[in-house]
Amino acid sequence: QARRRSAVGAVVRAGDARSFAPQIVVWAAGASRRMAPDDKLMLPLQGRPLLRHMAKRVLEISVPTLVALPPEPHPRWHAVKDLPLRKISYPESAEGLSGTLRAAVADLPPTVTHLCVVLADLPELAPVDFAQLFEHRRQYADCLIWRSLSPNGKPAHPTLFHRDTFPAFAQISG
């Protein structure tokens, strides 16, 4: 399929503009080295670990959700153990975010049309942020990547990827 750059810099293509079956992946597999010895995802926010706060926030959206976690046993597993989302650890996560991303994309069910990437350490994200991103996808359905913007117009999260981008994830590193 022919691809071109849109006026906003997103890669666009023709085809299946109406199909929308997203999967959210919450990235929580990192080592949290910069905060050592503390694990920032286990720090309390409103009386519960930040990771649990984020997972519950994402569950409000009613989209299938996967949380990528460090290998068990790890306290992060306990923080989300009773929540109705898929919890998984990928060996590739030892490589960093790119390894987790490669593994998660390869693990997506074939029915998933879009991947929504969410970092677990963004407590200010709210369901309205996802609603706006998904509406942006509807309005600009011929794009392949949709990225949220911060209030000052800088790229932010969450980010949404069309399935046509999934093969490229197999090549990422770093």
Indicate where each model-derived feature is located.
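Conserved alpha/beta core of the MobA/IspD/sugar-nucleotide pyrophosphorylase nucleotidyltransferase superfamily
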Residues: 4, 8-24, 166-174
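Nucleotide and nucleotide-moiety/phosphate-recognizing core
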Residues: 18-155
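Catalytic-core segments of class I nucleotidyltransferases/pyrophosphorylases
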Residues: 150-174
